[in-house]
Amino acid sequence: MGGGRWAAAGALLALAAGLLAAGSASEYDYVSFQSDIGAYQSGRFYTKPPQCVDIPADLRLCHNVGYKRMVLPNLLEHETMAEVKQQASSWVPLLNKNCHIGTQVFLCSLFAPVCLDRPIYPCRWLCEAVRDSCEPVMQFFGFYWPEMLKCDKFPEGDVCIAMTPPNATEASKPQGTTVCPPCDNELKSEAIIEHLCASEFALRMKIKEVKKENGDKKIVPKKKKPLKLGPIKKKELKKLVLYLKNGADCPCHQLDNLSHHFLIMGRKVKSQYLLTAIHKWDKKNKEFKTFMKKMKNHECPTFQSVFK
C-alpha cells in the first residue's frame, strides 16, 4: 500500500489543515463537537469531553496513517484507548490483504479520527469502494461487512474524508483473486501473531488430504496438536475437518505439498471450522522461530467481534 497509503493520508491531512485554518486554531487539546457526535450516534452523550491524544505505537491499524494525534471518544463510540485497540486489532489482518488502497484511511477516520473542531466522517462513496473490494476477501474468512460500518450512515454531499476523486476508486479495485486470501500471508513474526490473535483456534497439523466440496476446499487432518483450542472441544478434535471457504478454485500453494507440518489458524462459523491462515511449520526460518518465541508470552487483546 506504500505510496497510495501516504497519498491518501496527505489528502486527509490537507482537509484537516483547511478546517483548522478556518477555525483559527492550530491544535485542539479539547475539541468541541461532543453534541454533534452525540446527535449522530443515536443521541449518545459522553461523560468526559472529547480530547486529542497521541496515536500509540501499539494501535497497529492507524499508527502509520500519516498523522500523530486522534480524538477520543472516536466516531465508533469507543471512549477509551483500550477499547479502540481491542476493536481495531481485528481489522489489521484485512489491512494486510491490500484489498483496497483506501482501507486504512477509511477505517482510521472512524477508529482514530484526526483532531478537528467538529467530527468529519468518511465519504459514503469511499465506504462503498472499500466495502465492495474488501467484503469478498472477508467472506473467505466467514465474515460480512459489519452493521456498524453500513455505508448509508455516512455523508454523500457534505464535507467528508476522501482520498481520491470518486471515479478514481475503480482503478484501485483488485482484478480478481489469484491466491486464496487465507493462503496469501506474509511470513513475518508480527503478521503471524496478528493472525493468531484474530483467529479463534490454532493447531500444528499434518494434513491427510484436500478435497473440493460445495465450492470450498475440505481439509482432512492426519495429525494435530492444539496450540489454542478456542471453540474446539477436545472430543471434537479427533474428527476435526477444516474448510477453506470459497476456496475450491483458487490456489493455495501451501497445500501443494502435504509432506510438511503446518501452522493452521481458524475460526468457527456455525457448524464449520474455517481456515483463516496457513504457514509451513519451519523451525529453520528466522521469522517463524521469532514467532514461536513471541507466542509463548504474547497476550492477545480480548474483544467482542465487530463483525457480528
Swiss-Prot record:
Pfam families with a match to the protein in the record: Fz, NTR
Keyword annotations from UniProtKB, A to Z: Developmental protein, Differentiation, Disulfide bond, Glycoprotein, Secreted, Signal, Wnt signaling pathway
Record bears the keyword Signal: yes
InterPro entries in alphabetical order: Frizzled/SFRP, Frizzled_dom, Frizzled_dom_sf, Netrin_domain, Netrin_module_non-TIMP, SFRP1_CRD, TIMP-like_OB-fold
Signal sequence coordinates: 1-25
Entry comment, domain topic: The FZ domain is involved in binding with Wnt ligands.
Keyword Secreted: yes
Glycosylation positions in this chain: 167
GO cellular-component term (any): plasma membrane
Disulfide topology: 52-115, 62-108, 99-134, 123-160, 127-151, 180-250, 183-252, 197-300
Physiological role: Soluble frizzled-related proteins (sFRPS) function as modulators of Wnt signaling through direct interaction with Wnts. They have a role in regulating cell growth and differentiation in specific cell types. SFRP1 decreases intracellular beta-catenin levels. Has antiproliferative effects on vascular cells, in vitro and in vivo, and can induce, in vivo, an angiogenic response. In vascular cell cycle, delays the G1 phase and entry into the S phase. In kidney development, inhibits tubule formation and bud growth in metanephroi. Inhibits WNT1/WNT4-mediated TCF-dependent transcription.
Domain FZ residue range list: 47-163
Native source organism of the sequence: Bos taurus
Tissues in which the UniProt entry reports expression: Highest levels in aortic endothelium, heart, spleen and eye. Lower levels in lung, brain and kidney. Weak expression in liver, skeletal muscle and the medial layer of the aorta. In the cortical brain, localized to neurons and small blood vessels. In the retina, localized to the inner and outer nuclear layers with high expression in the neuronal cell bodies. In the heart, restricted to myocytes. In lung, highest expression found in the epithelium of terminal bronchioles.
Subunit structure: Interacts with WNT1, WNT2, WNT4, WNT8, MYOC and FRZD6.
The name this protein goes by in its record: Secreted frizzled-related protein 1
Superkingdom of the source species: Eukaryota
Similarity annotation: Belongs to the secreted frizzled-related protein (sFRP) family.
Domain NTR, residue spans: 180-300
Record's subcellular location: Secreted
